[in-house]
Amino acid sequence: MSEDSNPKNDLKLKMYETFRSHIERAENSFWTYMLFYLQFLVGINGAVGILCRYLSNNLQNFPTEIIIAFLALVNILLSLIGIIVIIERGKWFFRNMILTVNLERYILKEEHIKIIPKRYSKFDNFNKVIDTTGRIFISIFIGIYMISVIALGYLANSCKTIILFGTGFFIIVVIIYFLDLLDWIYRRIDSNEYRKVIGVVLFISFIPPLMNYFIYDIINLICSYIPESFIVAMIVILIFVIIDVYYNAKKHIENTIIMLSLERTVNDIDDIIKILKNIRLDDTKKEELKKKLRKIKKLIENVIKLLGGTSENGTQNNNLEEAKSKITEACRKISGNNIFEAINELNEAKYIINNKINELTQSDSS
């Protein structure tokens, strides 16, 4: 049976084609959804603005400032959700990029046209999670966010609007922590993404009616009993909470980058071990393998820099330093033509890196 008709190769090719079409379909659907999401956000702002202008000209004592402040808070919430969704999409697509590269490495030859090198010229840059389209959308959402914050600051000329400003940010922070709690719960039960989305939508849908019917009375009540010094203290506390949320999000993104880098390292080591087992090495091939191993060492050094030198990560860094020394020793063994010993060194390095991946997975899930 020829290699072209090998059932194993046919299965790999079918998986590759299905995976490729799935990525392209998901990518196109996502940006279409984000375009409609942005149009909906702009349309709501335009409709509410026209309605407020009409009602303020025809009704006395119409609470225009309250409605504009409420709309600004909704803009802040929706723009933050848009930014988070784009970042999560970037991490998902970046993971699929690595899977695609691994499939291409086993299926396609060097002269074939590949997906990832065609679209991304600097795939080795693991910090490039967000592409150009994602940056454009994030810039638009940041612009909407900044305009809304400026509008709230302009309206903050009385105690009522200051409390509205602080209450709105408090609601946003509560929603962020609630979404994180939902994610923690749903990762531990047998469920699907639709139930999570429905739960989040139901929770958010209760906020506008509550704000419409009760926020004005709540503001009047708070203004009657709470001094302004307490309001300032509450805003300061909210700022610290927001900083904590930002720090946790930043840490999660760094852990994702570390995980992807280590998974890429394990895959590259597997490829080198297969070459060492199946191919007779000449001087040119030895230099190619040593060049790949030096790239792996550089990748591990970048991971160590991301982990930092704190006491919390000191043991983990020592383990990765040991893996790096194993790779250095494997280079020496390859130069000395000790192939079996080089394979043993690479297997030990891979074992250390896999343990590190398991530690990161457990810490991220907790």
Curated annotation (Swiss-Prot):
How does it sit in the bilayer? Multi-pass membrane protein
Q: Which domain of life is it from?
A: Archaea
**Membrane-spanning parts:** 30-50, 66-86, 136-156, 162-182, 198-218, 225-245
Q: What UniProt keywords apply to this chain's record, in alphabetical order?
A: Cell membrane, Membrane, Transmembrane, Transmembrane helix
Q: Which GO terms describe its cellular component?
A: plasma membrane
Subcellular location per the Swiss-Prot or TrEMBL entry: Cell membrane
Could you identify this protein by its name? Uncharacterized protein MJ0976
Native species: Methanocaldococcus jannaschii (strain ATCC 43067 / DSM 2661 / JAL-1 / JCM 10045 / NBRC 100440)
